[in-house]
C-alpha cells in the first residue's frame, strides 16, 4: 500500500473509531495556508483538532512518537485561523489518534506542547 493510501486508510479508521465514541467529524484534511489538520470533530461541546498517525508496526517506534513539537505548533496555528473563521466560542482541545496495523486506535486527548 502506498504512503498516501496508508494515511487515508488510517484517517478512515480514526474517523470510525471517533464516531463510535460519540464524536461528530466536521472537517477532514483541512488546509489553511501551509497548515493542515487531519480531523476536526466536536465532542461534548468541545472542538477537537486531531492529528492521526498510522504505522504498520512499532518496529521503529509508536505512531504517537512521530508527532513533533513543531507539528503541534503548526496544528495550533492552523486551528487558531479556523476558530476565527467559524467564530467558535467554546472549548478546544488538541488530540492524537495513533494507529498501529490492525490494533485498536490509541486516543491521546488534550495533547500539549
From Swiss-Prot:
GO terms for molecular function: nucleic acid binding. Coiled coil: none annotated. PANTHER family: UPF0102 PROTEIN YRAN. Belongs to the UPF0102 family. This is UPF0102 protein CHU_0465.
